[in-house]
C-alpha cells in the first residue's frame, strides 16, 4: 500500500468491547479518505452497540456457545463466509482485535491482515492467529519473548506504548443522557460491575464465585449506593432478576458509564483498562493468569487485585481533569505500517 493512497479496509468485530475500540478508528480512517467495511458477529452487545453508534455493518455468524465443538462449527462456517465476502469485495487490508475468524479468511482471500490483542495467555487464539496474521499489534507491556512461541516476532510483531484504551478514548465524549437513562442519583456511590465471561476459552475450568460475593457485598453496603451490572449473556441477565441492581435494557456506551461511576469491578480486561485510562478506581477479580498489561497497571496503582469482597472501597471518587491520553493517529499509522511491511 502506497502512503497517501486511499485503501479499502475491512474491520471484523466479534465482541462488545471491539465496537468501542474501533468506533473512533473507523471515523479517523474515513476522515483520511479510506473506505471501511465492518463485519460483526452476533454476540453479547456487539450488534446493539454498533447500532447505537450508527456504524453500518454486515452481520456474519454468531458465537458458538460454551462448548469447544460448538465454537469450532461456528468458527468454520463464519470463516468460510468471511473468505467469500473478502474475495468478492477485494479489500486492501483487514484488521481485527482478537478475531479468530478474520485472519484465516483474509489469508484465503490474499489480503494482508493485522491482528491486535493485549492479553498474551489466550494460547489457542494466539497459536491460531500467529499462523495466519500478516502483522500483530500489541502494547509494549507485553515482552517480545512472551509471543515468540506463537510465531509472533518482529517485523511481524509491532508494539505500541501505553494502553490501547489511551488511544481510542482520546476522542471520547461522555453521553450526557446516560445517567438519566439509567436513573443514576448524583448523591449515590455508583459501582459498575461486569461479570466473568463464562464462555471464554481462557476462563474454562476457572470458577469466579468472588464476583458474586462482591456483588452481594456492595448491594448490602450501609451507604447510599447504586450498582449497575452489565451482563454478557441472557443467562447472566436472567440470574440478576430480583436483585437490587440496575441492568440496562439496551446496550450502553461503556466509557460513558465508567466516567459516571465511582468504581468499576470487572472480571474481564477491557472495562478495567478503560477505567484505568479514565482515572476511575478499578478492581479485577479475574481468576486466571494476569497478563503483562494488568500486572503493569497493578504495579502503577491504577488497577487493584480483588481477593476478598471487603477489598472494595465503596466511596465517592475524586473527579477532576482526565489523565493524559495518546494520539490515535499513531495506532492508525501502526496498523497501516504493519500491513505495508507484512511478512506473509
State what each model feature region is.
Residues 53-66, 215-248:
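Catalytic donor nucleotide-activated moiety binding site of glycosyltransferases and closely related
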Amino acid at each position: 500500500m502506497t502512503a497517501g493512497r486511499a485503501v479499502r479496509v475491512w474491520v471484523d468485530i466479534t465482541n462488545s468491547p471491539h465496537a468501542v475500540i474501533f468506533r473512533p478508528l473507523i471515523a479517523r480512517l474515513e476522515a483520511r479518505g479510506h473506505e471501511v467495511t465492518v463485519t460483526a458477529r452476533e454476540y453479547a452487545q456487539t450488534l446493539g452497540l454498533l447500532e447505537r453508534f450508527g456504524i453500518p455493518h454486515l452481520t456474519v455468524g454468531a458465537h458458538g456457545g460454551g462448548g469447544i465443538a460448538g465454537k469450532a462449527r461456528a468458527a468454520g462456517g463464519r470463516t468460510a463466509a468471511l473468505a467469500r465476502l473478502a474475495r468478492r469485495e477485494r479489500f486492501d487490508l483487514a484488521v481485527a482485535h482478537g478475531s479468530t475468524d478474520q485472519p484465516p479468511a483474509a489469508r484465503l482471500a490474499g489480503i494482508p491482515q493485522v491482528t491486535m490483542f493485549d492479553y498474551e495467555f489466550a494460547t489457542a487464539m494466539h497459536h491460531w492467529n500467529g499462523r495466519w496474521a500478516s502483522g500483530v499489534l500489541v502494547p509494549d507491556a507485553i515482552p517480545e519473548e512472551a509471543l515468540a512461541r506463537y510465531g509472533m516476532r518482529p517485523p511481524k510483531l509491532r508494539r505500541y506504548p501505553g494502553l490501547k484504551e489511551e488511544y481510542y478514548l482520546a476522542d471520547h465524549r461522555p453521553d450526557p443522557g446516560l445517567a438519566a437513562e439509567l436513573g443514576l442519583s448524583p448523591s449515590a456511590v455508583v459501582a459498575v460491575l461486569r461479570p466473568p465471561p463464562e464462555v471464554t476459552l481462557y476462563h474454562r475450568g476457572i470458577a469466579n464465585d468472588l464476583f458474586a460475593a462482591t456483588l452481594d457485598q456492595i448491594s448490602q453496603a450501609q451507604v447510599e449506593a447504586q450498582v449497575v451490572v452489565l451482563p454478557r449473556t441472557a443467562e447472566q441477565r436472567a440470574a440478576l432478576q430480583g436483585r437490587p441492581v440496575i441492568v440496562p435494557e439496551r446496550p450502553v456506551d461503556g466509557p460513558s458509564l465508567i466516567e459516571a461511576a465511582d468504581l468499576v469491578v470487572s472480571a474481564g480486561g477491557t472495562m478495567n483498562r478503560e477505567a484505568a485510562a479514565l482515572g476511575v478506581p478499578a478492581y479485577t477479580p479475574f481468576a486466571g493468569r494476569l497478563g503483562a498489561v494488568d500486572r503493569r497497571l497493578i504495579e502503577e496503582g491504577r488497577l487493584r487485585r480483588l481477593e476478598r469482597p471487603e477489598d472494595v472501597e465503596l466511596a465517592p471518587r475524586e473527579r477532576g481533569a482526565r489523565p493524559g491520553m495518546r494520539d490515535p493517529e499513531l495506532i492508525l499509522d501502526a496498523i497501516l505500517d504493519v500491513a505495508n511491511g507484512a511478512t506473509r
